[in-house]
Amino acid sequence: MTIGKYNIIYADPPWRYESGKVQGAAENHYPTMSIDNLCALPVAELTAKDCALFLWATFPQLPEALRLIKAWGFQYKTVAFVWLKRNRKNPTWFYGLGYWTRGNAEICLLATKGKPKRQSAGVHQFIISPIE
């Protein structure tokens, strides 16, 4: 089977939080992976010479996200998107439990390999949307 090469990789890894059990933890909702297992995924084999990676991460996982970017053969550039979460049923802000502060935002990091071209100057960084 031949696998294509992609110009864009859009990833929302199943991060495993190593800081202990927390109510609402990802492990309670879906299978997660260790950072070592995520780094071992053969993502580099799927990328074109010029490729952009959009990688969703939470602030507690930022060091792991930067490690993952490097392991997959990319170079960190910036924060592409910031998701500001609203509650599902009313127009108030959603707040998670957090480790130090009550978290709201998630970030999507942008990393590149080669020299991918910017597609539009009209893309904004903020995404304001309810949680699913």
Predicted regions and their residues:
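Class I S-adenosyl-L-methionine-dependent methyltransferase catalytic core
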Residues: 1-132
